[in-house]
């Protein structure tokens, strides 16, 4: 009843024929989902071409910078699945010591070249749902190994907020707000890029890092006043993107050391998930993005959207135009919009050139559509799975984001017993814990304006049932229940 978007397919007109959270990645490890396989093996030693699982030979997929959401989802693709997969993992954990020390010397071209030598002729596809490094690395590697994927130049354009807006504004001016860029550090005497107030964020960033509404010069100066160690970390975070830009887009002067300012938007926020296969677009669904009152911090993602029937056609049409203009030809995507009911305007905020792992389960639970199965089929150029792989269990789903704004951490980390209770009581729920202390906590408050300590994904028969479930979990975990969380 809620699969309004799924199955809407559009042939995108290519504008050019030129080819353009937290993770738990394990270097070189491999496993057959839900089936014991040797870990840490080179793919050539596994002889997977001859390893049968039932009547199917497992397809070999390399996962780059795997995320916590990925690990749980991969267990569905075991020996008894319609199409089993053998997964390999490369990358590192960006937010965990000592794995993140690799950031100090990480070079995107050396990394891709190493993977090319190791996996050439030994995998059937490469996938990453990681926005920071993974999706770009996967694209670069796929091109070198002639595997399906989003073109690398397209990834760069999507992730470079200024380039994306420039390209889209030229063809669809009504889709983007007023925008301008400026370098940082910002010289105090430099003119501001736009009249205040405006919204500012890095040209290349994830998790809404340093994204803030600015209404005076002092607030902007404070936002961009970094300690030496912060400056060092920022340079290391954006260096891989700049390395790719220097080689693939040397014509672009504004690298990731720039900020972008946009005119303020008002209204409700939405995101749409879907995929493109050889230029053919299909949308999974439209999701509401609800913020903590008075902030720009995500509080809840809710599916199906309350605006679905009203905005379905417009979102579909604008998404189609945006993807065509970006020459987005093959792969999953997630696009975010602002809708202002007072002016009836629909504005683009982000184009994410990868699958949204946080919302992917919505479509499986509510519509019976497995976004991961489609993602893997795209990566290996296999026939797409049936639209309904399973019988939907629920009518609604949501992702609840638990935050603190008082400078403190959350003292109620879930215990093993509490996690076991959740798995037994609500087996379809997914809980991710991100509690921080010390320097990591202080950095998160400065860069994000809040501390996101947990995410809880749940589904319900209807809105009332979902509310009952999340309230039950909060009471059991000892977490404060913000009424806005379940309104």
Segments (PLM) and residue ranges:
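A short beta-strand motif that forms the metal-chelation/ATP-contact edge
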Residues: 138-140, 344-354
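Active-site "cap" helix and flanking loop/linker of ATP-utilizing ligase/carboxylase catalytic domains
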Residues: 314-335, 353-411
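ATP-binding N-terminal substructure of ATP-dependent carboxylate-amine bond-forming enzymes
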Residues: 2-13, 17, 23-27, 31-154, ...
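Acidic, glycine-rich loop-and-beta core segments that form the ion-binding/anion-interacting portion
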Residues: 289-306, 318
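Glycine-rich active-site loop/lid that clamps phosphate-bearing ligands
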Residues: 403-437
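Short, well-ordered beta-strand elements within core beta-sheets of diverse protein domains
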Residues: 212, 262-263, 452-460
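Phosphate-binding site of ATP-dependent enzymes
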Residues: 224-291, 314, 338-347
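A conserved helix-loop-beta module that forms one wall/lid of the active-site cleft
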Residues: 143-213, 217, 222, 228-249
